[in-house]
Amino acid sequence: FEKVLKTIPEDIPIIADAKRGDIGPSSKKYAYALLEQFGCDAITVSPYMGYDSIEPFLNYKDKGIFVLCLTSNSGANDFQVPNLYLQVAEKVREWNVHSNLGLVVGATHPERVLAIREKSGPMPFLIPGIGAQGGALEKTLEAVQDGTRVPCLINASRSILYPEKSVVFNDFKETQEFSSKDCISSSRHAAHELHQKIRNCLEK
């Protein structure tokens, strides 16, 4: 993790998708490690254990804290729906006294995004699920913005890390020939395509 961080240019914000959330003393150590020791600019946290598990992160007023609200995985329906995600959005709005809180809202639930926005008010959304999970980018952005132009961050992981999933290697030699340079080029192309797709949605 530390080696990866060292390769990131200083002007690029680093969000640790750590999903931390534990009893107060443990959360305090997690917050110190990720936000101070490693110097991440933001972190994702789980609200399931309540305010005292989140408070140590909130004390870092110059850091961004994204709270899991409605996640992009299919298991989100087990507990978060039908009402828990709305309670989270409302509660996080109360906790946002330093204006450094945001919500993690999956793009796989575009029909629920507007309800979250109504509960949360104008706080940033971190939106996963656009790539490999097949989230609805355009519908999600329409609901998130809703005429407010509130900032949101689109997260894509697997679709950029593994853009060549359709490539089938017949033997180890072929795998070697598909060099790291090819991987970087493919990932760069996938990121550019997503960036353009987002721009097109916002310009409509």
Where do the protein language model's features map onto the residues?
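A short alpha/beta connector and helix-capping loop motif
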Residues: 1, 5, 22-41, 139-143, ...
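A C-terminal functional module that forms or caps the active site or interfaces directly
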Residues: 107-155, 159-166
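Alpha-helical scaffolding segments of alpha/beta enzyme cores, especially the outer helices
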Residues: 2-10, 29, 33, 56, ...
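Alpha-helix-loop-beta-strand connector modules within alpha/beta enzyme cores
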Residues: 1-16, 120, 125
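C-terminal helical cap(s) of enzyme catalytic domains, especially alpha/beta-barrels
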Residues: 140-147, 151, 162-204
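Conserved anion-binding
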Residues: 18, 22-104, 122
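Active-site-adjacent beta->alpha loops and helix N-cap segments on the catalytic face
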Residues: 1-7, 23-27, 48-62, 108-118, ...
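Hydrophobic/aromatic residues located in beta-strands of well-ordered beta-sheets
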Residues: 14, 65, 103, 125, ...
